[in-house]
């Protein structure tokens, strides 16, 4: 009989955020990486590439100079303290979390299709409601007209990058238990 245990730091079905920095995973510098652990201590926790880079850069208290000179070959998981060996190729050779990666690709594809169509994809199955909205947009009345959609796309294109800007975390926040607990309780980005 196999016991299934829910590990609190593993991302849930709808969760696309790193549990260390609370920033959303993406297909770039915040790609979801799965820590393999060792034969003795299996890990399997998922963190973003930026947090993994920060963990690898932290020495054993060697200071900033030690961080610049070398990266550690073993990273300790901040959730279960299991050591994970870094591959020879560096952090980018660490295995991606395939489930989260596929969800991020689907999300990016949907956003691309939505941008091409100029209209966000509707997920409701109410055919009458959709027919009314289509009729309204054909008339040109209200915020569903082509002019409003074009303005909305321009607005999103101009202000979209600004929404993703967040101030960087101080380096001492990564292991601060009190701040991490507060962040978990409030689900806020610090």
Curated annotation (Swiss-Prot):
Record-linked InterPro entries: DUF4632, RING_finger_E3_ubiq-ligases, Znf-RING_euk, Znf_RING, Znf_RING/FYVE/PHD, Znf_RING_CS
Start-end of RING-type zinc fingers: 18-81
GO biological process entries: protein ubiquitination
Claim: Nucleotide-binding is one of the keywords in the record: no
Compositional bias segments (type: Acidic residues): 126-136
UniProt entry keywords in alphabetical sequence: Metal-binding, Zinc, Zinc-finger
A Pfam family matched in the record: DUF4632
Region spans: Disordered: 111-145
GO molecular function, one term: ubiquitin protein ligase activity
Protein name from the UniProt record: RING finger protein 227
Organism per entry: Homo sapiens
């Amino acid at each position: 009989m196999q016991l299934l245990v829910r590990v609190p730091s593993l991302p849930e079905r709808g969760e696309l955020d790193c549990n260390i920095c609370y920033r959303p995973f993406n297909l770039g510098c915040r790609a979801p990486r799965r820590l393999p652990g060792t034969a003795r201590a299996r890990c399997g926790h998922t963190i973003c590439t930026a947090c993994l880079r920060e963990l690898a850069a932290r020495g054993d208290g060697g200071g900033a100079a030690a961080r610049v000179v070398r990266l550690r070959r073993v990273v300790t998981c901040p959730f279960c303290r299991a050591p994970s060996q870094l591959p020879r190729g560096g952090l980018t050779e660490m295995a991606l979390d395939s489930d989260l990666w596929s969800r991020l690709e689907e999300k990016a594809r949907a956003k691309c299709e939505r941008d091409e169509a100029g209209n966000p994809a509707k997920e409701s199955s109410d055919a009458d409601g959709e027919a009314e909205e289509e009729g309204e947009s054909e008339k040109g009345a209200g915020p569903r007209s082509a002019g409003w959609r074009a303005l909305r796309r321009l607005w999103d294109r101009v202000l979209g990058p600004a929404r993703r800007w967040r101030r960087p975390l101080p380096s001492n926040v990564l292991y601060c238990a009190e701040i991490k607990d507060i962040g978990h309780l409030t689900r806020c980005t610090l």
